[in-house]
Amino acid sequence: MSKMSSLQGKMRQHTIIVMTLLFLFITGYLLTQLKVQFLSFFAGLSVSFLNLWTTYYLAKVVGKVADQKRKHSVLPFILAGFGYLIRIVLALSVVYWALINPDTLNVLLVIAGISLIYAIIMLDMLFQFMRKR
């Protein structure tokens, strides 16, 4: 299996997990009284997943450019740099939104939602390591 298809498989797996969690957060928001909590987790995880998808997409673009035998354009590498800036701005904007709207979003739970994608990735790596042993 090539590295790109492995990357695509991981992204597909993470997408399924995140979409399931987002569905649960929306369901919790609609069916319980914990609206601020579920909406905060939803906002944080949504932005975090968007950041992960941006990283995946730019890695794909840069990988395709690196595989080509001809002279490389600098544009994909510049876009990858801007991708980092975009990810930081997205995370800061959702935290800022939580700070200015404390009755709608809880800042700590938004940050926990942003961090949740990293927990998913670490657990996936742990399960993969345990399967190989």
UniProtKB/Swiss-Prot annotation:
Main location per the UniProt record: membrane
Entry keyword annotation includes Acyltransferase: no
A GO term from the CC aspect: plasma membrane
Subcellular location field: Cell membrane
Presence of the UniProt keyword Heme in the record: no
Membrane-spanning segments: 16-36, 38-58, 74-94, 107-127
Biological process terms in GO annotation: proton transmembrane transport
The organism's place on the tree of life at top rank: Bacteria
Record keywords: Cell membrane, CF(0), Hydrogen ion transport, Ion transport, Membrane, Transmembrane, Transmembrane helix, Transport
Membrane topology qualifier: Multi-pass membrane protein
Entry's family note: Belongs to the bacterial AtpI family.
Function statement: A possible function for this protein is to guide the assembly of the membrane sector of the ATPase enzyme complex.
Protein name per the record: ATP synthase protein I
Organism expressing this protein natively: Alkalihalophilus pseudofirmus (strain ATCC BAA-2126 / JCM 17055 / OF4)
